[in-house]
């Protein structure tokens, strides 16, 4: 089975890391701790649906100088190794006693001087993807090093898209556009709404989506009360207003 090609060339990720490091320097930050799918994907290209399992934490440490360090469960070593990172540290997970805590702390100690600061996103639309008890253990193990908010560092860098990213986003939006154009093929009077949802997901996949994270929508006479409920088997009727929203992903980019 041939290996999948990297989503971007190495130079794209190197540029992202360089911009993060420049922003970190401006905030007197010695390293950056990333733990969420989007942030880790951004600096490594590590793309997997295995994130849907909550059983394992994953980390990437971005030092103020040099390349990022992946601190990940051993199950992800091969996939991460296909990317551009060279320093990949693993543990056998899940481990109820030490699920990456000591390995992460050791990595931080190597890259952050005593009294230094490691940033991690803490603001709106962020979270730390590890048990709070383990986060507290890491904090204690790396003291007197401080963990500070890196929301602005990460978000200001990520929100400025490269031409390569724009092309990926455009491609994913094109998939959604083509799928929406096919809605009249299956959204017909008498067709159950839950089947319309399934047909829409099928259309997204047929048009090139790698997967469909969700489909949101609703239908009702003159409007609808909410768009987050699961679809029912109620048939579409004359006078219904139908709304569909996509959750399509292609090469890690979403529409």
Stretches found by the model and what they are:
Residues 37, 94-95, 122-125, 220-223:
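Acidic, glycine-rich active-site loops and adjacent beta-strand->loop/helix elements
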Residues 32, 118, 242:
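Receiver (REC) domain switch-region micro-motif
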Residues 57, 67, 113-117, 144, ...:
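A general structural motif
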Residues 2-106, 174-178, 232:
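N-terminal accessory/capping or targeting/presequence segment of soluble
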Residues 40-52, 151-156, 160, 191-255:
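Short catalytic-site patches enriched in acidic/histidine residues
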Residues 24, 169, 239:
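Divalent metal-coordination and catalytic microenvironments
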Residues 2, 17, 95-212:
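Flexible, acidic/His-enriched mid-domain "rim/lid" segments that flank
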């Amino acid at each position: 089975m041939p290996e999948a090609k990297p989503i971007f060339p190495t130079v794209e990720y190197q540029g992202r890391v360089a911009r993060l490091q420049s922003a970190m320097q401006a905030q007197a930050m010695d390293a950056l701790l990333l733990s969420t799918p989007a942030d880790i994907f951004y600096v490594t290209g590590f793309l997997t649906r295995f994130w849907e399992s909550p059983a394992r934490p994953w980390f990437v440490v971005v030092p103020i100088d040099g390349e990022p360090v992946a601190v990940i469960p051993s199950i992800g070593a091969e996939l991460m190794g296909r990317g551009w990172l060279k320093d990949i540290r693993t543990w056998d997970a899940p481990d109820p006693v030490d699920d990456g805590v000591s390995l992460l702390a050791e990595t931080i100690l190597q890259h952050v001087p005593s009294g230094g600061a490691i940033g991690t996103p803490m603001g709106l639309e962020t979270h730390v993807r590890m048990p709070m008890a383990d986060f507290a253990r890491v904090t204690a193990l790396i003291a007197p090093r401080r963990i500070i908010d890196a929301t602005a560092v990460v978000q200001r860098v990520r929100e400025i898209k490269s031409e390569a990213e724009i092309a990926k986003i455009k491609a994913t939006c094109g998939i959604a556009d083509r799928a929406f154009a096919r809605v009249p093929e299956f959204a017909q009077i008498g067709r159950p709404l839950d089947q319309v949802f399934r047909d829409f997901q099928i259309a997204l996949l047929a048009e090139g989506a790698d997967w469909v994270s969700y489909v949101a929508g609703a239908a009702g006479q003159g409007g609808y009360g909410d768009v987050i409920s699961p679809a029912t088997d109620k048939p579409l009727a004359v006078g219904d207003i139908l709304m569909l929203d996509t959750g399509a992903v292609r090469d890690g980019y979403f529409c």
